Amino acid sequence: DIYNVAKYENIFGANFNFKINLGAVKKYVAVDANDFYFPLKEAAAAVVNQNIKGTIFKDLSGNFEDVDYLIFTPPFLINQAETLANFHRTNSGLTVRVVTLENIYQEFSSGKQDIAAIRNLVKYVYWNASSPDKRVKYVNLFGDASYDYKKRITNNNNIVPVFHGFDPADSENNNNANISLYSSFMSDDFFGLMDDGEGTMTGSFDGIDIAVGRMLVST
């Protein structure tokens, strides 16, 4: 019934015929019932309640406090990251927050690995400080990085992802510029670009706004 999309009838047999009116270009798609793709269910489908945006600026008493230092870590390194955070709280007088990558992805990129999610959290903390002089100053990427995001190589160390870039001038004459050993590069400066319109990391861009470092730990 062409007037009722909820009413349909399966057609069986080797041949199928139908009539159409001429006068307009139309597209028809035939689908083999044996060739359907079914969505895969995530192994860890349950999502724990969290609210990074609502808690990142809260101290233990629930009062607002500006953040000086952000540490991003995978869950299996969180104890070591907290040890480092406590060192700087005690000896450097810094307000430090440790956030796991999984929680960042869950809140800023629908649960999927995305370097933009990490940068967007930094940007949220940066622009929501109580005053410009109280903005976050340091970011620590607590984990090794790899050029292989998809973990296809053996003994891969893609723990905290890194920005991949290439020279756009080279891409005009080279379709493989993104994998060129000459024009492609990796950089953590991406996570410190806080101004609107920044983040492309082309051949010319403004300086970073935050000190960004990485500890190449894997165990």
Predicted regions and their residues:
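A generic structural motif
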Residues: L94-E107
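Structured catalytic cores of large enzymes
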Residues: D1-P75, N86-T90, E107-T219
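A conserved hydrophobic secondary-structure block that centers on an alpha-helix together
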Residues: I78-A81, V96-V99, Q113-A116
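Well-ordered, non-transmembrane segments within structured domains
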Residues: E82-V96
